[in-house]
Amino acid sequence: MTYSFVVCENLPGLTIVAEERLDALADILGQYTVVGKTRGSDLAGSQYRSPFAVEVRRPVILSNHVTVESGTGLVHCAPAHGAEDYNAFLALDPGSFRSGLLCHVDGEGKFTDDIAEVVGDSAAKELVGQDIMEAGSRTVTKLLKAVGALVKVQRIRHRYPYDWKTGEPVITL
């Protein structure tokens, strides 16, 4: 996959988008100029800053479940909460399973204190105890907007497991 570095009139800094997604995202990006391109493999190992806790740096990793079929061609990774993310995490460092796997959701589907390791202490205060599928999701959206990291809110239909008896979502822990 090839990625474009774009400067958008309505967004600060550089935005990275899969080249094949630029046309599909034109309405969201607004007027933009491509200022560079790179292969996805060249991004591997580089780091990005969390929009919540800028002192936290995370590695860019590659995974074959990221495609140009939808979105930007970039996704976040939550290895404690899904098979694709878990496999990408293990491929990054097979020995890191015990020491690096962070689960910030409890058995009731609510954010725990461990969320601070992902979003920082300030944002964690607003998230701890919130249901991840309801109030927690709304709070994450609010927090992203507050730090200028939210470009668009849109409902996306995801394949997601539901318990056949209760109709409730199944959260992988």
Language-model-detected regions and their locations in the chain:
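Residue patterns forming the tRNA-binding/recognition surfaces of aminoacyl-tRNA synthetases
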Residues: 1-5, 45, 55-57, 70-173
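Protease-associated
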Residues: 2-74, 83-87
